[in-house]
Amino acid sequence: TAEHAYKHYTEYPEIKPIFMEMAERVVKKYRADNRILAWNIENEPGAAIGERSIPLLRELFALVRSLDPEQPLAADVYWGVRENGELKNEVEKTAYALSDFISFHSYSKYEKFLTDLYTFKKYYKRPVIVTEWLNRCNHNTVQEIYPLMMIERVGCYCWGFVQGKTYTTEPWDGLWKKAEENPDVDFDFTKWQHELYRKNFHPYDPKEINIIKRFNALADKK
């Protein structure tokens, strides 16, 4: 398709060996470091080049496993899952087959987030870590999503932290485009999209931080 017409940088023969060597050096250095919880072998495989990402995904998993790290490995399953448990494409099926746990991305509102999470836990008997979430514009909020993850005993990462040069406090262009195409779409552009703290290190919303602290404390008691 047109969106996959360009080359990924690892598809250039002069670049790929450098990339693989870098990956090997990093894993060798930290493979027994207890500060590393897990290895995300590839972020959102297939997003850039579709099924052409599968050979690289297999190579990277083989390389990292050959180095015998103490930590588990995963690649993101981020298109979601059908309610019958079927993964949506060959890239996701490959990522799941190679992974030790499910690395799940979702910026969906509560109902869709819960449906996907329930389906993963029902059909795939592996730990789940939500490695990307929080999109207030799309009603994926700390108030609704964080307590749900705690109750379901699902780990999570909030990749953004302080308002900065990534500008992810602002909605992605794709959200603006959807809103322009459909004025009735249910986005709230009055809110920050992402990040938890302002440049002055005060919380964007102190209530969010209190929720995170409160539910972390409850989780510690389990």
Question: Where do the PLM segments sit?
Answer:
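Carbohydrate-binding surfaces of carbohydrate-active enzymes
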Residues: 207-222
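Short low-complexity, flexible loop/linker segments enriched in glycine and/or proline
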Residues: 89-90, 143-146, 171-175
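Alpha-helical scaffold elements lining the catalytic groove of polysaccharide deacetylases
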Residues: 15, 19, 111-113, 118
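Active-site mouth of glycoside hydrolases
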Residues: 1-99, 105, 123, 133, ...
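Short Gly/charged-rich anion-binding patches and loops
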Residues: 59, 115, 144
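Substrate-binding and catalytic surfaces of secreted/luminal carbohydrate-active proteins
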Residues: 111, 120-130, 138-139, 143, ...
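Active-site beta-to-alpha loop of glycosyltransferases that engages the nucleotide-sugar donor
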Residues: 108
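Short, solvent-exposed beta-strand-terminating loops
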Residues: 155-170, 174
